[in-house]
Each structure stands twice: as structure tokens, then as C-alpha cells.
Amino acid sequence: MGMQCPICETQSHVFYCAHCINSSPDLLIRLKFDLYILGKINNALRNKVDQYLEEVDDELNTNIRNGEQLESNIGVQILKERLGKVQVLRKERQNNKIKHKISQQDRRIKEKSRYIAELRSLINGPPKNQNRFTDPQTILKAQKQLQDKLEIAKRLSIQTRSEKLAMLNKWYSIRKRDSHDIPFTISYQPVISLKNFNRLPLPLIEGSLRKLIQYMNLLEHIYCIKYPSAMFVHEDEMLSLQGHSAKLKRNAPELLQVLIKLIQMILVVMTRSKLIDERKQNIDYAWILDQYDIDGLFYHMAMSIPIDTKSGAKNIQWSTDRLVDIVCSSLGAEKEEVLLKDHKKLEPPTDKKYEVSDRWYIVG
């Protein structure tokens, strides 16, 4: 199939479709022979070019430095010129890379030298704003501004803490009652004290201690303080003591330890919140417990009311054992027998029964 010019009808290219090539053996065989001949010619030319390249490489490596002439072969001469240009371009490229790296290093060295010179001038020379640091009025003004900011932050912190403490007291319903036996309550349960400790039933003591420990653990976050590990009481410890009277009697030493830790927590919070005057030396904590008792200290702490203090003997070292001795002497019992003695029960009506696991609440 011939393709001709539509104007002059001159044949410019011969085109065979795929159908004609596949269906005509004459065309297929002839084209295959042409392809085979072209492959042979290409292989011969490729081999010749490879030979020229080898000759040029050998001549360039051996004779070009001595100025000897290459063979009078036009192909060799052309390849020699082309390869020479290629080598020159490669060397120029390598030289340009080296120059670029040198310029980068030179620029970095200059920047570091300038930075070092600036630092030396700052160290050895006078300060830029010398009057700012030597003028007494400027210093006093800056101090006054910092003190004002600190005072504002302090007032905001105290106000926020007071609001949180008021919400906590409202949540736990801390009340003061006109009663000599049970003057203070928390969540409608009596606040335990040394004077009513022997007169309350064990379930009521356990319930009061649980509420007080819950309150003190929440108070730790409000005042942003951390109780010592030996002083901290987890709520699970109180739940493990909940149960029948026999179980409470077996766990009497644990209840005593919780009572001692409660007193320590109250004293720590009152000291951190400056409700106890720290300026006095050798504070007599036995006198404080005698005057305020546990319930009084707890109420003053919850309402942020300062308490009076008294200095004691200088040679007394206050510790947990010393506090245990004070509590035991106030209760009139030995350490191991504080909770094992018979407690006077709050007698209910005679026609009704009650269990030791019942919850007791103060009404009115």
C-alpha cells in the first residue's frame, strides 16, 4: 500500500497494514530479511566503534603526554577530539564542585568569625543599656512592678482556694452544733474526738474516720501539698475495716493508726496554711490537743480559723510515737488496748433491733 501526495501524487512513504503483513508471506519474509541485515550492520558498526574507543583510550593513556601522533585514521581522530572534550568537561565539572564547596566553607568561616567577634565585644565591652542596670529609679520601678504582679497572683490564688474550700465544706456539710458531747459534724456524722472516742460505738467511729480521711485527701489537692508517705491513708484501707463488730475489734490497731495519721494530716495542713504560728519555738502540741481536741482542730482547719499556741519544753522531740503517747494518755489506755476496751453503745429503742453495720447520722 503506497501513500501518495494528494496534490502532486508523488509517493513519499510505503506503508503496510498489520493485516497485509500477517497475511502475505512475501512481505513478511522480505521484511524479516531486511531486519536481519540491519541487525548485522548495526553489530558491525558497534564493534567498530568499540574498537575505536579502545584504541583512543590506549593512545590517550600512553602517547598524548609525549606529543606523539596517532594513526592517520579519521574515526580515531574524531573520537580523540570528542573524548578530549569530554575529559575537559568532566574536569571542569569537578573543579566547579570543589570551588563551590570551598566557597561554602569560606562563608561559614566568615560567619563564625563574625559571631565570635560579636561575643567578644559583648564580653569585653560595656553593656548596651548600661543606664538601665545602674539607674536606681529604674531598678526600684522594675521591683515594684514584679511585686505588684506577685501580689495579684497571690490574691487570686487565695481567692480560688477559699472558693474551693467553701464548696468542699458545703459538700461535706461541716456544721457546728450547740452540744457538749458532739459539737461538730461532717456529713451528718459526729467528728471523732478524744473525749467522745470511748462513748461512741465502733461502727460510728469507723464511719466518722472514713469521712474525715476522704475530706483530708481532697484537701491535699486544694492546698497543693503532699502528705508524707507514712502519713497518707488510702480510702481502701478504710473500706477494709468496714464490717461486723468482731472484725472491727480485730482491726483495732489499724483504727488507732488511722486516728494518729488523721491528727498528723490536720497539723500539716494548719501549718502550711499558717493557721498555726510557726514563729513560736517548740510548740506544745499536747496543749493544743487538750485545748481544741481533734474535732476542734478539724473545724478550725476547715473554716480557716487560726488557733492559739503555746511553747513547750525545749528538749522534747515531737514524733509519731510521742503523738501516740499523748493520744493514749488522753484516752487513759495502753496503745494496744485503746480500741479493744468496751465502748458504751448508743442504746436504741428497746422494741427494735439494730446491727453493728448500720449507719448512724446526727439529726438536728
UniProtKB/Swiss-Prot annotation:
It comes from the Eukaryota. GO terms for biological process: cellular response to potassium ion starvation; cytoplasm to vacuole targeting by the Cvt pathway; pexophagy; piecemeal microautophagy of the nucleus. It is found in: Preautophagosomal structure membrane; Vacuole membrane. Pfam families: ATG14. InterPro entries: Autophagy-related_protein_14 (IPR023261), UV_resistance/autophagy_Atg14 (IPR018791). GO terms for cellular component: fungal-type vacuole membrane; phagophore assembly site membrane; phosphatidylinositol 3-kinase complex, class III, type I; vacuole-isolation membrane contact site. Residues 38-114 form a coiled coil. Component of the autophagy-specific VPS34 PI3-kinase complex I composed of VPS15, VPS30, VPS34, ATG14 and ATG38. Interacts directly with ATG38. Required for cytoplasm to vacuole transport (Cvt) and autophagy as a part of the autophagy-specific VPS34 PI3-kinase complex I. This complex is essential to recruit the ATG8-phosphatidylinositol conjugate and the ATG12-ATG5 conjugate to the pre-autophagosomal structure. ATG14 mediates the specific binding of the VPS34 PI3-kinase complex I to the preautophagosomal structure (PAS). Required for survival and/or proliferation in kidneys and in brain. Belongs to the ATG14 family. This is Autophagy-related protein 14.
